Amino acid sequence: MKNVKIALTKGRLEKKAIEIFKTININTRELQDKGRKLIFNCENEEYNIELFLVKAKDVETYVEYGAADIGIVGKDTLMETNKEFYEVLDLNVGKCKFALAALPSFKLDQGYNRKKIATKYPNIAREYFRKKGMDVELIKIEGSVELGPIVGLADAIVDIVETGNTLRENGLVVVEDICEISARMIVNKASMKTKKDEIIKIIENVSEVIRQ
């Protein structure tokens, strides 16, 4: 049984993925009291798995370069970049959406003024406005993008919306939904050949859980 390395996004998706792994009998005992550890042995009679926790944007890199065979990461991260791997499963967890949001006075029509859009996801925002035939100025922000329209930095924002509470608390409204997103499983292309049996087993078992 070949060793399979899984890169898992820290935080919210981590907890949901571990629940799925438990259901298919992957050994997650070391993850219950992980402290500062980053690598975990999840081996048992059914699986030979090594799991490590990384930031969302790094999951793709680990998988693309073969340091991880499998990755669990949000679709938002995948949409923003263009890296080489297989996207094999929608895990149906971590559901939220991309949306255009602004102060209630904002009008989406182009008008004469070029709109300024604040976002952590410039590639996704660029593609969204390209499809609308709109020329906008994108302002990349790493922190709380909701602040952009409030202080006059931007006319609107493109961001992830889960409950909408943060928008409401800051006086913003959703102007338009862009797309639904959720957690995905990705696989290194070479690993799919060299560790095919082990990886297919994990994919099939996780698929069965998702369908239930």
Swiss-Prot record:
Species this protein is from: Clostridium botulinum (strain Langeland / NCTC 10281 / Type F)
The protein's annotated pathway: Amino-acid biosynthesis; L-histidine biosynthesis; L-histidine from 5-phospho-alpha-D-ribose 1-diphosphate: step 1/9
Domain remarks: Lacks the C-terminal regulatory region which is replaced by HisZ.
CDD domains: PBP2_HisGs
Protein task: Catalyzes the condensation of ATP and 5-phosphoribose 1-diphosphate to form N'-(5'-phosphoribosyl)-ATP (PR-ATP). Has a crucial role in the pathway because the rate of histidine biosynthesis seems to be controlled primarily by regulation of HisG enzymatic activity.
GO cellular component: cytoplasm
Gene3D superfamilies in the record: Periplasmic binding protein-like II (3.40.190.10)
Catalytic activity: 1-(5-phospho-beta-D-ribosyl)-ATP + diphosphate = 5-phospho-alpha-D-ribose 1-diphosphate + ATP
Recorded family membership: Belongs to the ATP phosphoribosyltransferase family. Short subfamily.
Keywords from the UniProt entry: Amino-acid biosynthesis, ATP-binding, Cytoplasm, Glycosyltransferase, Histidine biosynthesis, Nucleotide-binding, Transferase
Known partners and oligomeric status: Heteromultimer composed of HisG and HisZ subunits.
This protein's name: ATP phosphoribosyltransferase
SUPFAM superfamilies: Periplasmic binding protein-like II (SSF53850)
Domain of life: Bacteria
One example of a Gene Ontology biological process annotation: L-histidine biosynthetic process
Xref: PANTHER family: ATP PHOSPHORIBOSYLTRANSFERASE (PTHR21403:SF8), ATP PHOSPHORIBOSYLTRANSFERASE ATP-PRTASE (PTHR21403)
InterPro entries cross-referenced by the UniProt entry: ATP_PRibTrfase_cat, ATP_PRibTrfase_CS, ATP_PRibTrfase_HisG, ATP_PRibTrfase_HisG_short
Enzyme class: transferase
Intracellular or extracellular location(s): Cytoplasm
UniProt EC number: 2.4.2.17
Pfam families named in the record: HisG
Gene encoding the protein: hisG
GO MF assignments: ATP binding; ATP phosphoribosyltransferase activity
Chief place of localization: cytoplasm
